[in-house]
Amino acid sequence: MRVLVDQVAIDRPGVDLLYDVIMPSTTVAVPSVICIHGGGWISGDRTEMHPVASKFAENGFAAFCVGYRLAPLHPYPAAIEDCQFLVKHLRENAHSIGIKSDCIAAFGNSAGGHLAASLAVRDIPGDISCRVDAAIDVCGLTDLTNPQQNHPMISWDFIKQFLGSKYEEDTSKWIDASPLFHVTEQSAPTLIFHGDEDDIVWIEQSKRLFEAMQEKGVPSRFEVLSGEGHSFTLGAFDRILNESIEFLSEQFSK
């Protein structure tokens, strides 16, 4: 495998958009996965996803760990825009990077799951699509207007910092930032994981996204992880990665 760090997708004043990439040992173009870290949109670092990226690379995927801008310094839509721009950057430069431009996926957990789901359901008009070709959402929020049944203050505080406003101040922003309300027939195939004992992000969030995708005819699966909370055991995370690799291999072989 080849590891390249501090690659620049956007050279901009103050905050470059950087990514690290782990490439499999091959000379042919390969499918790719954008690995998006969690942290409530306000913390975390792309290096946290290196173990995940290594697993994908070992199985023939180029894995890109993105360092998106964090709130509250950079509120919505900064994080989503950064992830979308990386998709565009990879498609524009697919030949030189060594990846397939039509086999780009996103994988994320928690806040990263929200961003991965956003990449599956959202696009920006233009010649080059910013929507991924498949996504894996691991316990991500999908409806920011209704974050948590049991512990509302946990999620509300993170969301307010992420969006930069209270719900009653800018309801439309809270709706716009929610992947659930962007699902269409064109949304990318999505694999969703959620622990049934998650006390940070309500499992209903994932169930509702799955149901919305099923209603629109989007290829999707919902895997409930029995006995798992928001942080997974090693065995559960191995299952997540193995099933994600199988899912992407299946989608990209069509």
Residue ranges and their predicted role:
Residues M1-K254:
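Alpha/beta-hydrolase superfamily serine-hydrolase fold, recognizing
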